[in-house]
Curated annotation (Swiss-Prot):
Source organism per UniProt: Macaca mulatta (Rhesus macaque)
Modifications the protein undergoes after translation, according to the UniProt entry: After being transported from the endoplasmic reticulum to the Golgi apparatus, the single glycosylated precursor is further glycosylated and then cleaved, followed by its transport to the plasma membrane. Autophosphorylated on tyrosine residues in response to insulin. Dephosphorylated by PTPN1, PTPRE and PTPRF. Dephosphorylated by PTPN2; down-regulates insulin-induced signaling.
Residue numbers spanned by region Insulin-binding: 103-111
Phosphoprotein among keywords: no
Encoding gene per record: INSR
Name this protein carries in UniProt: Insulin receptor
GO annotation terms (biological process): insulin receptor signaling pathway; protein autophosphorylation
SUPFAM superfamilies xref list: Fibronectin type III
Quaternary data: Tetramer of 2 alpha and 2 beta chains linked by disulfide bonds. The alpha chains carry the insulin-binding regions, while the beta chains carry the kinase domain. Forms a hybrid receptor with IGF1R, the hybrid is a tetramer consisting of 1 alpha chain and 1 beta chain of INSR and 1 alpha chain and 1 beta chain of IGF1R. Interacts with SORBS1 but dissociates from it following insulin stimulation. Binds SH2B2. Activated form of INSR interacts (via phosphorylated Tyrosine) with the PTB/PID domains of IRS1 and SHC1.
Low complexity compositional bias, start-end: 137-161
Length: 210
């Protein structure tokens, strides 16, 4: 449960089949990385619009009114249909309006205008890759580099950064915890372990992810 923009109230139940007496719980939490697509998206595009929640009644043309009237006249001789209530009509209008708004939003997001070419200011419909003929490809010789086998030489590898220290909390005699100091609008992965001894760490259960 989110208590505020920087706190989470975590509650859990004890294991249904505990392996021994549960003495304490270990809670770890780790901030998740942001999606790269959120940074690549240009939010200043004119065509990018968010769907509006304002409701506007749909416009019904005269042709559709005549069509509905003719269908009603044809079916009037056979059977009588129950009229729709005001709530049913309002619900259908809201669904139709929401569907149109959502479709407009999809068109604005998916169909993004092509970037303009440098200098002219007009849209460049041509593809960016240059077309090559098969003759050009057949006359090209590619040299594949090989690595010489020197016994005293080792390849230089990129140094890996050490694992970031994950904050954790030891919870005793209760099944809840308030995690503070969190970043708003950010995803966190929370791990929970049930333990029956302080040491060693192998006395804890498999982590449950939240």
């Amino acid at each position: 449960v989110s208590n505020s923009s920087s706190q989470i109230i975590l509650k859990w139940k004890p294991p249904s089949d505990p392996n021994g007496n549960i003495t304490h719980y270990l809670v770890f939490w780790e901030r998740q990385a942001e999606d790269s697509e959120l940074f690549e998206l240009d939010y200043c595009l004119k065509g990018l619009k968010l769907p509006s929640r304002t409701w506007s009644p749909p416009f019904e043309s005269e042709d559709s009114q005549k069509h509905n009237q003719s269908e009603y006249e044809d079916s009037a001789g056979e059977c009588c249909s129950c009229p729709k209530t005001d709530s049913q009509i309002l619900k259908e209008l809201e669904e139709s309006s929401f569907r149109k708004t959502f479709e407009d939003y999809l068109h604005n997001v998916v169909f993004v205008p092509r970037k303009t070419s440098s200098g002219t200011g007009a849209e460049d419909p041509r593809p960016s890759r240059k077309r090559r003929s098969l003759g050009d490809v057949g006359n090209v010789t590619v040299a594949v580099p090989t690595v010489a086998a020197f016994p005293n030489t080792s390849s230089t590898s990129t140094p890996t950064s050490p694992e970031e220290h994950r904050p954790f909390e030891k919870v005793v005699n209760k099944e809840s915890l308030v995690i503070s100091g969190l970043r708003h609008f950010t995803g966190y992965r929370i791990e929970l372990q049930a333990c029956n001894q302080d040491t060693p760490e192998e006395r804890c259960s498999v982590a449950a992810y939240v």
